[in-house]
Every structure is written in structure tokens, then in C-alpha cells.
Amino acid sequence: MTRPQAILTDIEGTTSSISFVKDVLFPYARRAMPAYVRDHGNHPQVRHWLNQVADEIGEDVPDEVLITTLQTWIDEDRKHTALKALQGLIWGDGYKTADFTAHIYADAAIQLKAWHAAGIPLYVYSSGSVPAQKLFFAHSDAGDLSGLITDWFDTEVGPKRESASYRRIAERIGVPGPEILFLSDVIEELDAAKRAGMRTALLDRLDDYPTPRSADEVGSHQRVESFSQLVL
């Protein structure tokens, strides 16, 4: 098998721990949401996303209702584009004030740097908004890694469990599906990418998945427990 022409990676559970997102980022956004909406609700960008939440509810409601809705969506881990955008704006404040840095596994940081040095273009596809992704990599435990990434994709390109999303990404980066390696910890995402013709690898990290996925679950995907085990 030849070396892929591009590598597309997920973040949560792949380059970075699930617990950081669930135990640090989500609670931070939930706590900060009321004050953020009150302080920035008249900003056009923020109001745009709040209006999308109102459209989803289907009612003309006050901001307090929107805040409660957004907090409920955080609790439910809802993959709504407006929520992800607002979370990204809030996390941006957190990174700037050094309330936290983004977790990235050491093996992921090392391998991303090596692939970049070898001339393999790197792309990110996450349910988090593109601005949030950029902040995540710019403020990681391993320093500013954002310069390693050629381009970024979020759910505006489509849901992560639909093969059409991966076809769109392949078209946008100008690389045939079979020449792209997609990395994720979610089998349904890998299945969708494979249907779009991409190569796939399951990150089955013991820190995130203490019980390894079975051979039946893994199917035809390459299974690894760290980036260092990946075979290109």
C-alpha cells in the first residue's frame, strides 16, 4: 500500500482525550454561557447563532430560554452547529485567559509533526466548529500545533456519520478518497468514510476505551491504540 496523499483526523478520542472535552471544555462552556450571552448577545456573530437556536425551537423566545436550551444541549452532547459555534467562542475566551490548555496525546503530537515534516497534508474533521478546532490546536499541551494543519472541517460540510460528508471533503481538498487516511475513535464515522472510499484507522485508546473494541466491531478498519502504531 502506498503512503496516503492526505491524512484526515478527528479530535475527541483520537488526537485528544474524551475526558478533557467532557470534563473540562463542556462544563466550562455550560458555566460561562449565561454571562457570555448577556454580555455578547448583541454582537452580530453571536446573535446569528442565537437566532439559529430560536429557529430550531420554532419560537420567538427570550435569551434566557435560549441559554437554558443551549445548556441542555451541552448536557446531551448535541451536535448542533450553533451550539458548537457558541462553545467555540466561549472556549476562545478561556484559552486567551489561560484558564486551560487543550489536551493532546504525546504520540499524536509527535506523529502529526513527523507527517507534516514528511510533506503529508493534514486535515481536521470534528463536530466542534472550525474556530474552536483552530483554538484547540493553537493552545495545546504541546504548544501551537495549528500550523501543522492544512485545512479544517466541521459539521457545516455535513454530519460525520454520512458518507456524503467525506466525499465533499475529498472534493474540497482535491485528493481521491482512496488516497486519504481518516482517523477516528468512532466506528460509525469510519464506516461512513470507508463507504466514501477512504482508508480508515480506528483509534482504540485504553484511556478512552478501557475495554477494547471486538474484532467484529472493528471490522475491516485498521485498529491501533496510539498514533505510533499506525501503518501508512
Swiss-Prot record:
The keyword Coiled coil does not apply. Binds 1 Mg(2+) ion per subunit. Belongs to the HAD-like hydrolase superfamily. MasA/MtnC family. Signal peptide: none annotated. It comes from Xanthomonas axonopodis pv. citri (strain 306). This is Enolase-phosphatase E1. HAMAP family: Salvage_MtnC (MF_01681). Keywords: Amino-acid biosynthesis, Hydrolase, Magnesium, Metal-binding, Methionine biosynthesis. Its cofactor is Mg(2+). Its EC number is 3.1.3.77. The gene is mtnC. Monomer. Bifunctional enzyme that catalyzes the enolization of 2,3-diketo-5-methylthiopentyl-1-phosphate (DK-MTP-1-P) into the intermediate 2-hydroxy-3-keto-5-methylthiopentenyl-1-phosphate (HK-MTPenyl-1-P), which is then dephosphorylated to form the acireductone 1,2-dihydroxy-3-keto-5-methylthiopentene (DHK-MTPene). Pathway: Amino-acid biosynthesis; L-methionine biosynthesis via salvage pathway; L-methionine from S-methyl-5-thio-alpha-D-ribose 1-phosphate: step 3/6; Amino-acid biosynthesis; L-methionine biosynthesis via salvage pathway; L-methionine from S-methyl-5-thio-alpha-D-ribose 1-phosphate: step 4/6. It comes from the Bacteria. It catalyses: 5-methylsulfanyl-2,3-dioxopentyl phosphate + H2O = 1,2-dihydroxy-5-(methylsulfanyl)pent-1-en-3-one + phosphate. One of its GO terms (molecular function) is acireductone synthase activity. Pfam families: Hydrolase. One of its GO terms (biological process) is L-methionine salvage from methylthioadenosine.
